[in-house]
Amino acid sequence: MTTADLLAAGHKVTVYDSLISGHAVAVPPGAELVVADVRDQEVLGHVLADHSIEAVVYYGGFIVAGESMAQPGRYFANNVGGAICLLNTMLEYDVRRFVFSSSAAVYGEPESVPLSEEAPIRPVNPYGQSKAIVEAMLRWYGSQSDLRYVSLRYFNAAGATDKLGEDHRPETHLIPIVLQVALGQRPSVPLYGSDYPTPDGACIRDYIHVSDLASAHILALRRLEEGSGVYNLGNGRGFSNREVIETARRITRRRILVKEEERRPGDPPVLVASAEKAKAELGWQPQVTSLEGIIESAWRWHRAHPEGYG
């Protein structure tokens, strides 16, 4: 979505993706796609040199917290190693503007919510730790060079547009899983943990629509002219996994069965954002602020694309 927004604003965009989890068909017309690993410094250098790149928006990295608990080495090699290669190559080719897709996972288990950017950084899984390491790296790179960066700490990205939606193989995100059950593509929704210290015993998360995340990246690119910064991106309201499932039942009018499972290691009980800093400094204002709106958009996409991107 960020790519489409940049193209609409008249920018030239090169998408660099290994396609390990991405989909070539999701790249909009007008953008060039280079299929390669970000750790391939030779290919990366050619792209930066040949395309006169002015800024990099880095969405790369593995993102499944539970998987990171089982495969920490894989996550650090890809998420941290990839960022090191990218930043070093950027500086070699005089590219000095960087927007980083970070995560609320850097906070771990917060003492209170909503979380501001000043909350302690105490990740509880290798995924969150990998994001925290890259943020620390950026502070050092920024202090020792003229690199300017913005780190955007996403809370739970969700929802879809008519053209773009979630299609992970395997799917691990709650809302797509719930909608797959509604479509009859899987028997039930696994509910990981029913004994958390929350009103209904389930994890609570702050959901933010993907189109609002995309707009934040555009604003972050503009912010780079003024300097570096770190911003939370969320709606400021938390919903439990049970509330998400019940909302999906109302929207889809389908039977959605739940199977309670043990807690997953590395899942904090509650993560809710304060995004006041992003609103004040970036001029960011989320447009899809209700859980119903987020799930309705995802439901439209999943019904129209029951096999995902194919």
At which residue positions do the language-model features occur?
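A short acidic, helix-capping loop that chelates divalent metal ions and anchors anionic groups
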Residues: 65-69, 160-165, 199-201
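C-terminal substrate-binding subdomain of Rossmann-fold SDR/epimerase-dehydratase oxidoreductases
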Residues: 177-310
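Short-chain dehydrogenase/reductase
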Residues: 76, 124-132, 168-176, 206-207, ...
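Short aromatic-enriched loop/helix-cap "lid" or pocket-rim segments at secondary-structure transitions
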Residues: 25-27, 111-113, 161-166, 203-204, ...
